UniProtKB/Swiss-Prot annotation:
Complex and partners: Part of the 50S ribosomal subunit.
GO-annotated molecular function: metal ion binding; rRNA binding; structural constituent of ribosome
Name this protein carries in UniProt: Large ribosomal subunit protein bL31
The organism of origin for this protein: Syntrophobacter fumaroxidans (strain DSM 10017 / MPOB)
Keywords, comma-separated and alphabetical: Metal-binding, Ribonucleoprotein, Ribosomal protein, RNA-binding, rRNA-binding, Zinc
Function of the molecule: Binds the 23S rRNA.
Encoding gene per record: rpmE
Length: 76
């Protein structure tokens, strides 16, 4: 193998937004992530509730005119 072509390998810590720190090795000195296995809903079993009700209502209001079928006025 050629010498001097490999990147410098550091002992580093992955820091999550939840405060978890995971020691590892990398070519970067510091790694920051927004979500990790200690706070991800898949691994914790907890689900985050997303307020999608407002989005659904806004969608329905926007497209309700397409759902309404105009009925012609019947003459008697």
């Amino acid at each position: 193998m050629k010498e001097g072509i490999h990147p410098v390998y550091h002992e580093t810590v992955i820091r999550c937004a939840c405060g978890a720190e995971i020691p590892t090795g990398s070519t970067k000195k510091e790694i920051r992530v927004e979500i990790c296995s200690k706070c991800h809903p898949f691994y914790t079993g907890k689900q985050k509730l997303v307020d999608s009700a407002g989005r659904i209502e806004r969608f329905r209001r926007k497209y309700e005119k397409f759902q309404k079928k105009e009925t012609p006025e019947s003459t008697e």
